[in-house]
Curated annotation (Swiss-Prot):
Catalytic activity: a 2,3-saturated acyl-[ACP] + NAD(+) = a (2E)-enoyl-[ACP] + NADH + H(+)
Annotated residues for binding of NAD(+): 48-53, 74-75, 111-112, 139-140, 244, 273-275
BP GO annotations: fatty acid biosynthetic process
Protein name (record): Enoyl-[acyl-carrier-protein] reductase [NADH]
Amino acid sequence: MIIAPKVRGFICTTTHPAGCEANVRQQIAYVKSKGPLANGPKRVLVIGASTGYGLASRITAAFGSDAATIGVFLEKAGTEKKPGSAGWYNSAAFDKAAKEAGLYSKSVNGDAFSDECRAKVVELIKADLGQVDMVVYSLASPVRKLPATGELIRSALKPIGEVYTATAVDTNKDELIEAHVEPANEEEIANTIKVMGGEDWELWLQALDQAGVLAEGVKTVAYSYIGTDITWPIYWHGTLGRAKEDLDRASSAIRQQLSSKNGTANVAVLKSVVTQASAAIPVMPLYIAMSFKLMKEQGIHEGCIEQIQRMFYTRLFDGEFVTDDAQRIRMDDWELRESVQQACRDLWPQVTTENLSQLTDYQGYKAEFLKLFGFGWEGVDYTADVNPEVNFDVVAM
């Protein structure tokens, strides 16, 4: 079939297999261009491995450090009538490239919140790798089925305490709007912590530890975002921030758990990037369009792969292991430079629908968004007939 982009709300409902492969190949080429990672991991589990920072972590481990990788995700395969999800095609492309390079690659497609999924991964590690020396936790899901009760819990993207009102961009109409978001109640706050907090990360590390599949000196990282005063009302001071604070609690608990094997557990605070997750947060698209323009002008712009490659190569494995007071690895350091943030604050009141594309990198934001789904990649013939059915080495749960 010939596949064109169809955008509804903040998701693109179609995906392009060849474009997704181009995305993965480009990320691999970037990591290879940086040379090998001297003291990198060799057996890596990535939970949430199919898009964004999780995918970038899997690519960096494999192609920077020749690591064997197991990726866990929940994605949809394509059928002859309908394309699959971008994460499915990304993972298929990764698997193909890894095997071409002679690297071990296995994927598990299932609910990463479930005990069954954990058991399957433990079984795979025992059979194929023995142990893992790194566990990356990069899940972004709006819902979680609690393994103990089967109860389905939904998160809420809301402020706490008062209505949040701010200028935002309607990405469908390309115009500025006033966004009003009602504050969360106590139940919504608790639910968001349950879905997006650190409990599941803890459950994973407990299961892996109890099964004896964590190597001496194992490192685990979970990804977070803090942002700045511009986005704090909807993010860090809202329900999402409470969940991310719970990641800090979990990281401390996991650190204690791993101390007997000299393991480490840290939250890595990353910069804002265009992802399916960030597109859903009011104000983020406008803030990202602004910060992208400023960071590109200052020569410090990074996407997912640049961030993760820098973290692996300069913080986690080579270079100095520096953390903040809460033991977090701060990869948002460039974005938080005052030269970027003050310029954003100055720019915010000046932006109108008419000057949106001049004052911000809004067109760059839109292009990046479509690229997530495989559209707009150079060298891909979008008029060609493509097969939406792409199979690879994946364990279906």
